């Protein structure tokens, strides 16, 4: 059975790249262009990993993650944030969210694959 991934990103180019990289890695990929839709999909599909932009049109990625962490069905899903803010302020926003990490933009395909692999191994 394929592992499931959810990509939440409002930038169509980033969404497509992340989706393609995950599909090549063998994931069934679900997509959302905002946090509210992403939260709904996460609750329904229970993906093995969530890739989420830090800045979404309807709420911050950290806020969406906190909502997911409060739900017993989604609280343990690893979340990898994608952000252009790899400086201290960007890390600060997500550092207290359990079972999460980040990938900087622009996305390096090798780093992306390595980070996803690390989170899937930890979750297994």
Please report, for each region that a protein language model flagged, where it lies by residue.
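Charged docking surfaces used in two-component/phosphorelay signaling
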Residues: 16-24
């Amino acid at each position: 059975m394929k592992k499931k991934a959810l990509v939440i990103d409002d930038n169509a180019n980033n969404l497509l790249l992340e989706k393609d990289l995950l599909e090549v890695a063998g994931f069934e990929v679900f997509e959302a262009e905002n946090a509210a839709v992403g939260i709904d999909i996460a609750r329904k599909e229970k993906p093995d990993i969530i890739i989420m932009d830090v800045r979404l049109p309807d709420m911050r990625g950290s806020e969406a993650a906190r909502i997911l962490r409060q739900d017993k069905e989604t609280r343990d899903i690893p979340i990898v944030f994608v952000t252009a803010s790899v400086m201290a302020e960007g890390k600060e926003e997500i550092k207290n969210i359990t079972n999460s990490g980040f990938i900087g933009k622009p996305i390096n395909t090798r780093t992306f694959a390595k980070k996803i692999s690390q989170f899937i191994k930890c979750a297994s």
